[in-house]
Amino acid sequence: MLKTVLITGCSHGGLGAAMAKIYHAKGFQVFATVRNKAKVGSLGGIDGIEIMELEVTSVESIRQCANTVAKRTGGTLDILVNNAGVNAIVPLLDASLDDAKKVYDANVWSVVAMAQAFAPMLIKAKGTMCNISSVSGEMVFAWAGVYSSSRSAGTRISETLRLELAPLGVRVVTVILGGVQTSGNDPSNIADLELPSSSYYQKITAVIDLHKKTMVHPNKQNVDVAAENVVNDLLNGRGIFIRRGQASTLSWLFNTFLPYRLFTYLINRESALDKIGFRGDTE
């Protein structure tokens, strides 16, 4: 019987879609989920990859997906990859709390909901859960407070699941992903940032907008290369953390060996904080 894998967030041009193709090439039966099947791209034409609609912020949608997968596989799942997530770049003083909660629903609580729904299948298969987090969760970036804090929380959730699922025979691995060039961070696919007229940061809107769009960067890792590295690391049983993508290892080194204030200063040099009176930490 074929090994099985379910991957969330498999829209065309993203990490999930790239991983789906690699697992398929390695002989897995692949369940690739997307919010909207219209965005599935070339995955839709590959035999052996089943496209499923899934809204990871909906418990009911997750339940229906789990029931369908259980029927297809006889109640087992070898690998669950929680890859779906959303970005958010906005000053915290201007952030909509409703929108911020949606980011946490997608990047944090969806991991818990997926774990709850698919745990019986993973336990039965003595399988693996792979949770995709981000290097942003290890850094304090201006304008990324909502996103980076959600990634920090997601990493802690993943690590707690590792402890709690280990006695049940399920391996949990956290991927700390650095810069990867995907369709999702192509500037042409990202709307311009709009700050309220009352924002304290109006005069640096253009700078924050550049951070929002992340821009195409020559040093970002190709999505297909990153996907293959992550899949191979996971299948080779390489540790409880996987670091791939631009600056993922560098982040760990800087966090470990640089003074906190220096590290924070270095990564915020291009944030235009000095244009609004920023002079570093006050303590």
Swiss-Prot record:
Residues reported to bind NADP(+): I7, T33, K39, E55, N83, Y147, R151, V180, T182
Entry-linked PANTHER family: NADPH-DEPENDENT 1-ACYLDIHYDROXYACETONE PHOSPHATE REDUCTASE
Entry annotation: catalytic residues: S133, Y147
GO MF term list: acylglycerone-phosphate reductase (NADP+) activity; triacylglycerol lipase activity
Purpose: Short-chain dehydrogenase; part of the gene cluster that mediates the biosynthesis of the mycotoxin cyclochlorotine, a hepatotoxic and carcinogenic cyclic chlorinated pentapeptide. The function of cctT within the pathway, if any, remains undetermined. The NRPS cctN initially catalyzes the condensation of L-serine (Ser), Pro, L-2-aminobutyrate (2Abu), Ser, and beta-Phe in this order to produce isocyclotine. After the dichlorination of Pro2 catalyzed by cctP2 to produce isocyclochlorotine, the cctO-mediated transacylation of isocyclochlorotine can furnish cyclochlorotine.
Glycosylation sites: N131
Position of the signal peptide: 1-20
UniProt similarity note: Belongs to the short-chain dehydrogenases/reductases (SDR) family.
The enzyme's E.C. designation: 1.1.1.-
Protein source organism: Talaromyces islandicus
Biological processes per GO annotation: phosphatidic acid biosynthetic process; triglyceride catabolic process
Alphabetical UniProt keywords: Glycoprotein, NADP, Oxidoreductase, Signal
GO cellular component: endoplasmic reticulum; lipid droplet
Pfam families (alphabetical): adh_short (PF00106)
Name of the protein: Short-chain dehydrogenase cctT
EC class: oxidoreductase
Keyword Signal recorded: yes
Organismal lineage: Eukaryota, Fungi, Dikarya, Ascomycota, Pezizomycotina
Gene: cctT
InterPro entries per UniProt: NAD(P)-bd_dom_sf (IPR036291), SDR_fam (IPR002347)
